[in-house]
């Protein structure tokens, strides 16, 4: 569950309610997007220990996450404080997480993500994958990595169900029981639909956004919204 939106107590109560509703076989996670202070993360991390599979980026920075890890039993996951090979030394120094949520775009592609898996195995880290909004090419790259990386110990994330359009032939990729089948076709097993690609490229040209700006999307829902840190 994406957190850092409502008061931490309300979000903790929501997680507990979800876990009780889903039952013991469905894992639940929370990601406050580093908006909680260390003190808040400790307080509600202890409350949530019996309910969550892992605790993703509750507070900001490797050193702060390392302090949190000293007092919680729940595994800590990140796709914010360790996102590149240059940040691995700090990750090891502070033991800021137990699970690195790799994004194959940020880490440098599929081969680089495979290398990350080997580093995780050396330093006793688990691996899963982070997803932002993406289309079928990126999704299938993720699926292939999920099959190829033995270090992946948790179901990987995707925002794909939020997307309505697609640029690959055959349209949207279907999930079956929460999983994807990896194609036996060459490469990623998908082909580009040139008509759809041209259409979405035109959307890009017309939208006027050339850099990522999460505030614009949020302001559609809440005018005046600004990115904040340690707001709770």
Q: Where are the predicted features?
A:
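Structural signal for hydrophobic packing residues in well-ordered secondary-structure cores
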Residues: 19-22, 49-52, 146-150, 201-204
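Short, charged N-terminal helix-start/capping segments
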Residues: 32-49, 117, 213-217, 221, ...
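Shared catalytic-loop signature of beta/alpha-barrel
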Residues: 47, 60-77, 82-187, 191
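Metal-dependent enolase-superfamily TIM-barrel catalytic cores that perform enediolate-based chemistry
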Residues: 1-69
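Extended hydrophobic packing segments that form well-structured cores
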Residues: 188-232
């Amino acid at each position: 569950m994406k957190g850092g939106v409502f008061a931490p107590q309300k979000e903790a109560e929501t997680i507990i309610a979800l876990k009780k509703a889903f039952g013991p076989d469905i894992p639940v996670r929370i990601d406050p997007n580093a908006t909680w202070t260390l003190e808040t993360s400790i307080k509600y991390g202890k409350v949530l220990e019996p309910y969550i599979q892992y605790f993703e980026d509750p507070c900001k920075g490797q050193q702060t996450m390392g302090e949190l890890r000293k007092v919680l039993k729940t595994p800590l996951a990140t796709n914010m404080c360790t996102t590149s090979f240059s940040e691995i030394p700090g990750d090891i120094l502070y033991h800021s997480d137990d699970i690195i949520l790799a994004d194959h775009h940020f880490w440098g592609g599929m081969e680089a993500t495979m290398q990350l898996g080997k580093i995780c195995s050396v330093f006793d880290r688990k691996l899963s994958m982070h997803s932002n909004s993406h289309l079928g090419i990126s999704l299938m790259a993720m699926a292939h990595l999920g099959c190829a990386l033995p270090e992946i110990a948790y179901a990987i994330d995707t925002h794909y169900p939020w997307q309505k359009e697609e640029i690959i032939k055959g349209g949207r990729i279907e999930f079956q029981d929460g999983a994807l089948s990896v194609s036996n076709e060459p490469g990623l097993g998908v082909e580009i639909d040139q008509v759809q690609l041209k259409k979405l490229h035109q959307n890009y040209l017309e939208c006027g956004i050339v850099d990522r700006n999460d505030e614009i999307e949020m302001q559609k829902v809440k005018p005046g919204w600004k990115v904040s840190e340690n707001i709770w």
